[in-house]
């Protein structure tokens, strides 16, 4: 619906700037749609408010200009009221929420550079969330005037301004030296400075839930401007009908804040009376199902670090202070900077080439915009022979310092958000879940024969793999032994009535577990199709959150690498994970002339949470699993 509103403004004043379009949206004859439901744009872009989709922002409120939705519409359209008066009309683009659990993101790559034209639907940047790398698109035609957050900047809070766009190319030059700090200094409000808003928090320091904890599907409602929260109109557990008054906030006037979808209020994160609630601060949690409320009793929003890029480590002070009249130890090579006084600006390609060639970027003079080092600088760089001289001309004797390692000895790989989440969840699992392991050998002879026949029948339509049989057998075994299809929920053990099998998939970004939903009622052909589609989307980083969040049982298969057996780590809050090894030909006793047969035997290991699944129960599950694979015809019963 947001796309519709913008298009209406553009059609009314096609050559107008963003500020003029704002006026049309607010007062003109073509008003925004007042529906509370989303149009096609909602699936393509989330607003700059954390976990607050476009569909929640559709329409112009009949209240004052400071009504929450109106204020955010004004911010996203770049109205004059939200810009510096000395600058042309422009739009401050905030970091959007790109996944239900996203609290902060990393700019993986800017797809548009400063000065470039951005067409409607163009990809602006790729953002690394806590789950995947996701791109977000522009909803209207504009120009990239200024990038405020450099590539690779980590832990950017949702709602933080990341770039500036303008409607006219001639306005780009005005933002050449634009920064968020300078913008604050030139706004009228700067004349009456106010104390910096304190972080919005409960009176006592929250004891955050263990890192990596998972929660049912939910929506995190966040502040759309600096506010004072006056009162909550609804209490925990109350059912929210469409567009109820949720809370009252105070800024220049007292307004009510509405939600646009049904649900249940599961958690209030900001108490009544809290002052200076900053933009993007999480206010409350809303869930779709009433039974999910209890899961958020100890929910705390994830803390994020400052928006500013991490500064390089400070240069250590000299070992011995030189006299005031002392001369430099050695002249700096001609044409080279004396040394970095801060961050070295370098393009991603140049940085990669420098690492491969062992080139010290501090010795390279950049010829790109504002001294940025580009590929041409790396290609033309010639190491100076005089460079080692400073090492020989040491300062007066002092404590010895270990020499720096030679270039190219190692590479520090930054930890991605996905890798950080994997580390947190696996650490939590090994430290808090009492694992035990059960192994068994399975004769795969019958499965291989059935698979061969089925693939002949499906020739040209796809193939069924051994892994598809394993998924189906696991799902049916979970129906027979439901304790293995359960979840530890701290206060209760949740026994699931459907089997959603998570399948571990290795991707360049890390491990992810897309889900085959309702595997117990799906046929082998459908399971095979689902697995191929999910694995492809996982490797391309195109999985949607609902496709990998949840699951009741997990399978990890390393048999294709020749691994005979291994023990997998449980994926909380699930109770079991099945590790699949490679199949091997083994001799087994047989009632024939030779007295033996050669069988393809596969070794599997079931990791169980002893809080949920006792040893005998785990053994029963493996017995059922083995029966289904050794007699695959029983899967039809």
From Swiss-Prot:
**Signal peptide segment:** none
Q: Does the keyword Nucleus apply?
A: no
Tell me, in one coarse class, where this protein mainly resides: mitochondrion
Specify residue ranges for compositional bias: Pro residues.
310-321
Q: Gene3D superfamilies recorded for this chain?
A: 2.40.50.100, Chloramphenicol acetyltransferase-like domain (3.30.559.10), E3-binding domain (4.10.320.10)
GO MF: dihydrolipoyllysine-residue acetyltransferase activity; identical protein binding; pyruvate dehydrogenase (NAD+) activity
Residue numbers binding CoA: 451, 465, 556-557, 581
Compositionally biased region (Low complexity)? 201-211, 322-333
Supply the EC number(s).
2.3.1.12
Record PANTHER family: DIHYDROLIPOAMIDE ACETYL/SUCCINYL-TRANSFERASE-RELATED, DIHYDROLIPOYLLYSINE-RESIDUE ACETYLTRANSFERASE COMPONENT OF PYRUVATE DEHYDROGENASE COMPLEX, MITOCHONDRIAL-RELATED
- The name under which this protein is listed is Dihydrolipoyllysine-residue acetyltransferase component of pyruvate dehydrogenase complex, mitochondrial
Q: Which organism is it from?
A: Mesocricetus auratus (Golden hamster)
Q: What is the lineage of its organism?
A: Eukaryota, Metazoa, Chordata, Craniata, Vertebrata
């Amino acid at each position: 619906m947001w796309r519709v509103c913008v298009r209406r403004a553009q059609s009314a004043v096609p050559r107008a700037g963003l500020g003029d379009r704002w006026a049309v949206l607010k007062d003109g004859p073509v008003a925004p749609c007042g529906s509370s439901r989303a149009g096609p744009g909602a699936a393509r872009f989330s607003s700059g408010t954390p976990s607050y989709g476009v569909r929640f922002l559709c329409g112009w409120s009949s209240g004052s200009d400071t009504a929450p939705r109106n204020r955010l519409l004004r911010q996203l359209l770049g109205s004059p009221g939200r810009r510096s008066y000395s600058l042309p009309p422009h739009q401050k683009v905030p970091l959007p929420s790109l996944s239900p659990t996203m609290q902060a993101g990393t700019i993986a790559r800017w797809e548009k550079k400063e000065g470039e034209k951005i067409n409607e639907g163009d990809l602006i940047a790729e953002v690394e969330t806590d789950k995947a790398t996701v791109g977000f698109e522009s909803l209207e035609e504009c120009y990239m005037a200024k990038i405020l957050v450099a590539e690779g900047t980590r832990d950017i809070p949702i709602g933080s301004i990341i770039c500036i766009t303008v409607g006219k190319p001639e306005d780009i030059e005005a933002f050449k030296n634009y920064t968020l700090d300078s913008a604050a200094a030139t706004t009228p409000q700067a004349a009456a400075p106010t104390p910096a808003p304190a972080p919005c928090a409960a009176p006592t320091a929250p004891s955050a839930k263990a890192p990596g904890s998972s929660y049912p599907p939910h929506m995190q409602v966040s502040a759309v401007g600096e506010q004072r929260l006056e009162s909550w109109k609804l209490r925990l557990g109350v059912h929210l009908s469409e567009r109820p008054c949720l809370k009252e906030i105070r800024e220049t006037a007292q307004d009510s804040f509405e939600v646009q979808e049904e649900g249940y209020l599961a958690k209030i994160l900001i108490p009544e009376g809290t002052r200076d609630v900053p933009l993007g601060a999480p206010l409350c949690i809303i869930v779709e199902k009433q039974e999910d409320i209890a899961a958020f009793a100890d929910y705390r929003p994830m803390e994020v670090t400052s928006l500013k890029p991490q500064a390089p480590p400070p240069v250590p002070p000299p070992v011995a202070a030189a006299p005031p009249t002392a001369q430099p130890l050695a002249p700096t090579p001609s044409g080279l900077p004396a040394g970095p006084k801060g961050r070295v600006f370098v393009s991603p390609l140049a940085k990669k080439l420098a690492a491969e060639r062992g080139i010290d970027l501090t010795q390279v003079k950049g010829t790109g915009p504002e001294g940025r080092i580009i590929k041409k600088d790396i290609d033309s760089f010639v190491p100076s022979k005089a460079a080692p001289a400073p090492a020989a001309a040491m300062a007066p004797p002092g404590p010895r310092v270990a020499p720096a390692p030679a270039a190219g000895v190692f590479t520090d790989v930054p930890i991605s958000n996905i890798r950080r989440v994997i580390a947190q969840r696996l650490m939590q699992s090994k430290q808090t879940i009492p694992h035990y392991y059960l192994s068994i050998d399975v004769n795969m002879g019958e499965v291989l024969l059935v698979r061969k026949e089925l693939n002949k029948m499906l020739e040209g339509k796809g193939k069924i793999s051994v892994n598809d049989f394993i998924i189906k057998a696991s799902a049916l075994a979970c129906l027979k032994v439901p304790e293995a299809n359960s979840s530890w929920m701290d206060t209760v053990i949740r026994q699931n009535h459907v089997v959603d099998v998570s399948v571990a998939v290795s991707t360049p970004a890390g491990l992810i577990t897309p889900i085959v939903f309702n595997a117990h009622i799906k046929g082998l052909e459908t399971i095979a199709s689902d697995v191929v589609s999910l694995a492809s989307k996982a490797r391309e980083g195109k999985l949607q959150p609902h496709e990998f969040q949840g699951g009741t049982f997990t399978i990890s298969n390393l048999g294709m690498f020749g691994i005979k057996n291994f023990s997998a780590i449980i994926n909380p809050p699930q109770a079991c994970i099945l590790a699949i090894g490679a199949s091997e030909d083994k001799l087994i006793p047989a009632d024939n002339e030779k007295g033996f047969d050669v069988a393809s035997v596969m070794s599997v290991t079931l990791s169980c949470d002893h809080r949920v699944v006792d040893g005998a129960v785990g053994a029963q599950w493996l017995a059922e699993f083995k029966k289904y694979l050794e007699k695959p015809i029983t899967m039809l019963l």
